[in-house]
Amino acid sequence: MMKIRHKNKKPGKGSKGCKKPARQNGKKVTSRPSSAPQIVHGNDHASREAELKKKRVEEMREKQQVAREQERQRHRTMESYCQDVLKRQQEFEQKEEVLQELNMFPQLDDEATRKAYYKEFRKVVEYSDVILEVLDARDPLGCRCFQMEETVLRAEGNKKLVLVLNKIDLVPKEIVEKWLEYLLNELPTVAFKASTQHHQVKNLTRCKVPVDQASESLLKSRACFGAENLMRVLGNYCRLGEVRGHIRVGVVGLPNVGKSSLINSLKRSRACSVGAVPGVTKFMQEVYLDKFIRLLDAPGIVPGPNSEVGTILRNCIHVQKLADPVTPVETILQRCNLEEISSYYGVSGFQTTEHFLTAVAHRLGKKKKGGVYSQEQAAKAVLADWVSGKISFYTLPPPTHTLPTHLSAEIVKEMTEVFDIEDTEHANEDTMECLAVGESDELLGDMDPQEMEVRWLHSPLVKIADAIENRSTVYKIGNLTGYCTKPNRNQMGWPKRNVDHHCPQNNRVVEVSSVDRRPMLQRILETDPLQQGQALASALKNKKKLQKRSDKIATKLSDSMMSMLDLSGNSDDCAGD
């Protein structure tokens, strides 16, 4: 037992079994196993030789290049010197042309990004058969880019150019007619209003009924009109141009003139991103409209330098990135009606631009550090209202017309023959009927293949207690009588009527006659053959919606009738008791 204990016992500090670690300069030295001798392989030697050989070759090339340059300088003559100067001058002029073309994108600070945008624009022009140049109806000449039009007309493939006058709902009818008459002397021009249903992804509203039945209230809605005329123009090109396959239609123009909104309106869905700031569209995007037409969306182009006031007022440059926002506001005050601007911002009695901006900053609470009113922030707020359309404006066409330098009489004649300009003028006249001046209570919604009659009857009716209490409109459908608290006419496609929701003494009854729920095949057959399938699907969808609504209304009416019968039965029982 004693041997086992001594065997398992750890040796003490003074014993031989415990050796102290060696120290060197006061630090412990740990013993490391000796490393094996390094073996030099043949591959390492070969790689080292290859590197040396490569280095010698590079040095030899540099020496030869220096020798050739010295020999060239020795035998250089005046003639070769002049040729070299001319060559460098040509290269410099080519670079200047590229820089001028890149100035079409001054809102981009990065030169690489500007080059990328220009490449996207050139791709759209190269791949397209027809180019749609979108113009703002408030300032069509200011939105035209003659440099871009010249590029399109000079491109290979005999490109065609069509002008689209967008946002005609923001301009009086007479001014739009004058601009159409002015622009049709040069190129085919189509009046258009894009859909403004930004929160809806599919089934954007498009006006397909006869436009002579529309009124000014149509422009206050979010529906699109002018699309049928534009599709007819493209169809004429496919027919007269003898196009066998599909065509590509490029959509170009300044930022925020409505290029992407036009594509979404034709597609009737949110196919492209839209926004109220420049630079939303960054790359070319192809949208399939049907099997014959494909649309190409391009980034916005901007002619002129970055400091031009007109470019800023056309919303070609982001307002928040402006270094001097006061100068454009001064231009607005010089050209616009001061009374309307004063009433809009609630300021008056200002003499200079600084006084006006100080008053606006006071109204909006725009201050710097120390409580000083910020004229720059007030100017940016005014410019934001300007570019968003809150401050209305429009320009007049020139009194006399002269063809631009890039357009000739032959080009105008060719465009007139290809796109059937007379048919386009008649279609524009029909579209302009929507701008008729006058008050109207009708609201035109989506195309509805069903016809619904709403007749007002003056026959007496027994008062319904719930209808009188809730002050709702009384309806009569067939043999059932009931009420609806807030009828949604916009969804049902009914014309808007002046309804007295307070039940008068001679109660009026709205009788909704029975309507044929089948799709109107005759109206569908009258549409474009390419759109008949979509029209039939829309008709069937509306049929299901109306069927659900009628079932829901019938259920409500039956419940109300049953509740009335229960109340009458209880009152009789109480009287008997």
UniProtKB/Swiss-Prot annotation:
MF terms (GO), sorted A to Z: GTP binding
Annotated compartments: Nucleus, Nucleolus
GO cellular component term, pick one: telomerase holoenzyme complex
Residue sites binding GTP per the record: 166-169, 253-260, 297-300
Composition-biased stretches (Basic and acidic residues): 42-75
Organism encoding this protein: Mus musculus (Mouse)
Region Required for nucleolar localization, residue ranges: 9-28
GO biological process, one term: negative regulation of protein sumoylation
Record note on what altering G253V does: Mislocalized to the nucleoplasm. No effect on the reduction of MDM2 ubiquitination
Domain CP-type G, chain residue ranges per copy: 118-304
Cystines in this chain: none
Protein name: Guanine nucleotide-binding protein-like 3-like protein
Self-association and partners: Interacts with MDM2; this interaction, which occurs in the nucleoplasm, stabilizes MDM2. Indirectly interacts with TP53, via MDM2-binding. Interacts with TERF1; this interaction probably occurs in the nucleoplasm and is increased during mitosis, when the nucleolus is disassembled. This binding may promote TERF1 homodimerization. Interacts with TERT.
Region of interest (Disordered), ranges: 1-75
Stated role: Stabilizes TERF1 telomeric association by preventing TERF1 recruitment by PML. Stabilizes TERF1 protein by preventing its ubiquitination and hence proteasomal degradation. Does so by interfering with TERF1-binding to FBXO4 E3 ubiquitin-protein ligase. Required for cell proliferation. By stabilizing TRF1 protein during mitosis, promotes metaphase-to-anaphase transition. Stabilizes MDM2 protein by preventing its ubiquitination, and hence proteasomal degradation. By acting on MDM2, may affect TP53 activity. Required for normal processing of ribosomal pre-rRNA. Binds GTP.
Family membership noted in the UniProt record: Belongs to the TRAFAC class YlqF/YawG GTPase family.
Domain notes per entry: In contrast to other GTP-binding proteins, this family is characterized by a circular permutation of the GTPase motifs described by a G4-G1-G3 pattern.
Predominant location: nucleus
UniProt biased composition (Basic residues): 1-30
Gene3D superfamilies assigned to the protein according to its UniProt record, in alphabetical order: 1.10.1580.10, P-loop containing nucleotide triphosphate hydrolases
Pfam families to which the protein is assigned, alphabetical: MMR_HSR1 (PF01926)
Annotated coiled-coil segments of the chain: 43-103
Key words of the record: Coiled coil, GTP-binding, Nucleotide-binding, Nucleus, Ribosome biogenesis
Domain of life assignment: Eukaryota
